[in-house]
């Protein structure tokens, strides 16, 4: 399964094309719209979310509520585009109109300046429009399709925020994926410890008043994953490496860890490795899950536990200093619409890209043209592993 996305932040629409989805998968627009709505939610979101109410249109690859095996095309309209018709026009326009909302003051931490250098733009809006987090709308849409595949195979996925701007959220032990999903989706800030809810909201309000932004850490958990996804035979076949690349590809994400992650560097091997157990009902299990569900780049049957760190949003209402690319004079950076934090929304994006990578790996290992063959192949593999 592979996909491409296209579209600009203030262009007419966003598009994704997905190839390789098996035939026979039940899929409707509502399966996708629910996740698009979640992406637009979360405490601390700004004005753009009040303008856009994302709804997907499926224009190929689905007939009578089921996938056909053909490429699936998804579209989401940008309602805000009506205010940007001249600025984002495809055809050539008058020079005086081209300078409307022209950007020459690059924002520190954004793609503005380097994109302008790379592609030789004199208007940095060209960098801004495609590098905007608005692009993640389609990665969430693609991820929703991937999650439909996972659901048919009894694989669950959820996300929650574990750090807000340096404030760690205590997480109850031994929560199931279903419990994490339920608790996080009941929270406006996607945390499972609701005793911290108001404290974090007040903190977000304070940051907004100061014209600043905060980052944090999001955790995604995947349960019910078959043993043996990924491989140790080559560097680029390890599934944890593929997930890491997908997570760090999300706008503003700067790091990733699995299980105990960077804490491993402070511990001994006897404190980290997951002891192997066996029982007749479940087959092989682990006493702990310190490695986050991976051994040798392969899933080991334990839940995948992956965390991604998101830097503070670079667009500040009290902008940092920059330089005008035309005059080289110092200026305050350009201010575009922004939020004090987007961690709850970023969690939805992270969940989506992880789901896409896992679904793709399943389709790679259990290559099937249709859903029934896929389900049979996965069930047979699970039986084999249980009796190994």
Swiss-Prot record:
GO terms for biological process: amino acid biosynthetic process; aromatic amino acid family biosynthetic process; chorismate biosynthetic process. GO terms for molecular function: chorismate synthase activity; FMN binding. It is an enzyme of class 4 (lyase). Pathway: Metabolic intermediate biosynthesis; chorismate biosynthesis; chorismate from D-erythrose 4-phosphate and phosphoenolpyruvate: step 7/7. Its EC number is 4.2.3.5. InterPro entries: Chorismate_synth, Chorismate_synth_AroC_sf, Chorismate_synthase_CS. Homotetramer. This reaction introduces a second double bond into the aromatic ring system. This is Chorismate synthase. It comes from Streptococcus thermophilus (strain ATCC BAA-250 / LMG 18311).
């Amino acid at each position: 399964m592979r996909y491409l996305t296209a579209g600009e932040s203030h262009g007419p629409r966003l598009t994704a094309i997905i190839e390789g989805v098996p035939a026979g998968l039940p899929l409707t627009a509502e399966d996708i719209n629910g996740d698009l709505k979640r992406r637009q939610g979360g405490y601390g979101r700004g004005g753009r979310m009040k303008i856009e109410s994302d709804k997907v249109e499926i224009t190929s690859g689905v007939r009578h509520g089921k996938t056909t095996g053909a490429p699936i095309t998804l579209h989401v309209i940008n309602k805000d585009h009506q205010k940007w018709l001249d600025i984002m026009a495809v055809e050539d326009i008058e020079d005086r109109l081209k300078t409307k909302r022209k950007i020459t003051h690059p924002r520190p931490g954004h793609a503005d300046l380097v994109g302008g250098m790379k592609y030789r733009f004199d208007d940095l809006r060209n960098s801004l429009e495609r590098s905007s987090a608005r692009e993640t709308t389609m990665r969430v849409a693609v991820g929703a399709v991937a999650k439909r595949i996972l659901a048919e195979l009894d694989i669950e996925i959820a996300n929650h925020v574990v750090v807000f701007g340096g404030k760690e959220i205590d997480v109850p032990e031994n929560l199931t994926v279903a419990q994490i999903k339920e608790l996080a989706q009941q929270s406006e800030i996607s945390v499972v410890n609701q005793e911290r809810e108001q404290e974090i909201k007040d903190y977000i309000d304070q940051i907004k008043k100061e014209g600043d932004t905060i980052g944090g850490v999001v955790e995604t958990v995947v349960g019910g994953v078959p043993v043996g996804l990924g491989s140790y035979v080559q560097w680029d076949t390890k599934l944890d490496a593929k997930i890491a690349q997908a997570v760090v590809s999300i706008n503003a994400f700067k790091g990733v860890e699995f299980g105990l992650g960077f804490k491993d560097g402070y511990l001994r091997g006897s404190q980290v490795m997951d002891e192997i157990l066996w029982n007749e009902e479940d087959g092989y299990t682990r006493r702990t899950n310190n490695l986050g569900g991976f051994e040798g780049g392969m899933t080991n049957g334990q839940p995948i536990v992956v965390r991604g760190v998101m830097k503070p949003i670079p667009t500040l209402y009290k902008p940092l200093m920059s330089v005008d690319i035309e005059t080289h004079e110092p200026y305050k950076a350009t201010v575009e619409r922004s939020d004090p934090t987007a961690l709850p929304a970023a969690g939805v994006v992270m969940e989506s890209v992880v789901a896409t990578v896992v679904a793709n790996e399943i389709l790679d290992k259990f290559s099937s043209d249709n859903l029934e063959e896929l389900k049979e192949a996965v069930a047979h593999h699970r039986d084999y592993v249980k009796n190994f």
